Regions:
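Extracellular beta-strand-rich recognition modules
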Residues: 14, 88-101, 115, 162, ...
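Extracellular glycan-recognition surfaces and repeat-rich motifs
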Residues: 6-66, 73, 138
């Protein structure tokens, strides 16, 4: 993921382990090595078959309330203190994908599952930036939630990572993402 004005000035690609140095996972992180994870992972098992991966590693989440993963739901990843002093027209850009379908052939996003990125400038309170939700009900795919109403109504996530770019309103000295 990156924050940028005209050119990228901050990038976190997860290629090296930055847990507790470049980013934190306050509720915890971990993996059972296969299907339950909230961690920096790669396509190292038959369960993860993503394409268009930007490098080798990425931050992934699957069945995060399992004890082998974060053990709680929701779980968060924080990147704080990004220096934005003197920058304007900020943008957030990141690649997102969904691991699907599961072995049964069904999608595995259930009612209440979501992924959301929020930002705050100078500790001014978090604002929604981009969200993904199920399409309603259980065993649905993830869709972008374009109006933040809790229902996916936009672009459907696929197993191929796709880039999403959003504008960040405001200016200041320090940007936090979660």
């Amino acid at each position: 993921l990156s924050a940028q004005a005209q050119t990228a000035f901050f990038t976190e690609d997860f290629e090296t382990d930055g847990l507790n140095t470049r980013y934190t996972a306050p509720e915890g992180s971990g993996s059972d090595g296969d299907q339950d994870y909230f961690d920096r992972i790669s396509n190292d098992t038959s369960d993860r078959t993503h394409t268009n991966v930007q490098g080798t590693f990425y931050w992934g989440a699957q069945d995060i309330d399992d004890g082998a993963a974060a053990g709680v739901k929701p779980a968060s990843l924080l990147i704080t203190g990004i220096d934005i002093t003197g920058r304007s027209s900020l943008q957030f850009s990141a690649y997102f994908a969904e691991q699907r379908p599961e072995a049964s052939g069904e999608d595995d996003i259930d009612s209440g599952d979501f992924a959301i990125v929020e930002y705050q400038i100078d500790n001014g309170g978090y604002q929604s930036l981009i969200a993904f939700e199920g399409g309603g009900g259980n065993n649905t795919p993830f869709f972008e939630d374009t109006d933040f109403d809790g229902t996916g109504d936009g672009t459907q996530l696929e197993t191929a990572f796709a880039q999403f770019t959003k504008s960040i309103a405001g200016t200041g000295d320090s940007l936090d993402l979660r």
